[in-house]
């Protein structure tokens, strides 16, 4: 069997569009934007002449690092930034080049790159979520007046309209969609703390440099670094996991409706069986349940990654890198699978 996100299982559980936001290329491009913005900040406080800074900014943005060397060095350094900065410095010369990375630390780059990735993930997830809500609206318009048997505690209860169950699916999704603007604000924070989190290398220039970087990157400057306070990441992960759970609820319900037979639901497609060709397995529904449960388990690790010792934790950072992209990709996959599932429903409920 393939391990992790390799092999055929990527088609079941992966999301290429979201995975690309955490690729080497995306991360190193973010590093370049940070370093370029830092040069602009240093120029604003007079540490670099403006024309020299402008030249450096452009050259930094054009820099293409040796990814293989960075990967090899990261095993030794624990982070990709030291080798990235070494390579960058070797390519630059002239006035101001000695101040590349001045006042910053590796975590400033990796965290800010993650913030930029999460902003794009939120945009992708939000757009897909709005489409899914529209899909459910269309399903209700078509089948909402049909009748279903309510199920409470695994037993048949009273008759309900199909619209009642559809609303139960849709309402949590609408609430999550309404929270997107505040989530963007909470997640979109510049990370900039320097070596030990207090920007001491920049002295009285720290605030101006930080605000300049934030403005250049389109992020908010919270007034200080947050190396050991992971609220921006936890907020995003929590929203994504809550979304996965809402999708898992839909999958669980559809799977149980399929078990009850065509009186509850009929859909096109479905998975085949190697032993029983008569079967039409609700694979998309099963995927939603599995993805939701997986994200729930990953959230435990995200909470573990909140525990940083002293001013920085390499262990906590590594755990976060392992877990957070998976949460994003799992949620993205669930949104695609849920739209596929709802689109396959040909009838929900029986005639009243």
Task: Name the predicted role of every residue range.
Residues 119-126, 130, 137, 167-170, ...:
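Short amphipathic alpha-helical segments with heptad-repeat character
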Residues 208-296:
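Acidic, glycine-rich loop-and-beta core segments that form the ion-binding/anion-interacting portion
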Residues 45, 49, 63, 67, ...:
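Short secondary-structure junctions and interdomain/linker hinges
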Residues 1-30, 34, 58, 72-77, ...:
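Glycine-rich cofactor/substrate-binding loops
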């Amino acid at each position: 069997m393939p391990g992790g996100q390799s092999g055929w299982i990527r088609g079941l559980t992966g999301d290429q569009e979201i995975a690309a936001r955490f690729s080497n290329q995306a991360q190193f491009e973010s590093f370049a934007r940070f370093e370029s913005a830092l040069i602009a900040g240093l120029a604003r406080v007079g540490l670099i002449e403006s024309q020299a800074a402008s030249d450096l900014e452009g050259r930094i943005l054009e820099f293409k690092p040796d990814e293989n060397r960075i990967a090899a060095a990261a095993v030794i350094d624990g982070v990709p930034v030291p080798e990235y900065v070494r390579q960058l410095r070797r390519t630059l010369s002239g006035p101001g080049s000695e101040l590349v990375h001045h006042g910053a630390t590796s975590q400033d780059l990796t965290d800010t790159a993650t913030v930029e990735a999460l902003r794009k993930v939120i945009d992708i997830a939000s757009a897909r979520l709005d489409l899914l809500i529209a899909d459910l609206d269309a399903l209700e318009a078509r089948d909402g007046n049909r009748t279903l048997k309510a199920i409470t505690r695994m037993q048949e209860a009273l008759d309900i309209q199909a619209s009642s169950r559809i609303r139960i699916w849709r309402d949590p999704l609408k609430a999550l969609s309404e929270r997107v603007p505040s989530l963007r604000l909470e997640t979109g924070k510049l990370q900039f703390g320097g070596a030990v989190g207090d920007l001491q290398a920049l002295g009285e220039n720290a605030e101006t440099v930080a605000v300049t970087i934030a403005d250049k990157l389109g992020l908010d400057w919270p007034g200080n670094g947050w190396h050991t306070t992971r609220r921006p990441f936890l907020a995003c992960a929590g929203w994504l996991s809550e979304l996965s759970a809402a999708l898992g609820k839909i999958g669980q319900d559809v799977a149980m409706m399929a078990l009850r037979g065509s009186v509850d639901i009929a859909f096109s497609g479905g998975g085949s069986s190697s032993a029983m060709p008569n079967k039409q397995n609700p694979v998309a529904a099963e995927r939603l349940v599995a993805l939701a449960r997986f994200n729930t388990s990953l959230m435990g690790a995200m909470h573990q990654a909140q525990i940083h010792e002293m001013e920085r934790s390499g262990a906590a950072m590594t755990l976060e890198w392992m877990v957070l992209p998976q949460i994003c990709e799992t949620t993205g996959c669930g949104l695609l699978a849920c739209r596929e599932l709802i689109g396959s429903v040909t009838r929900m409920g029986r005639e009243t």
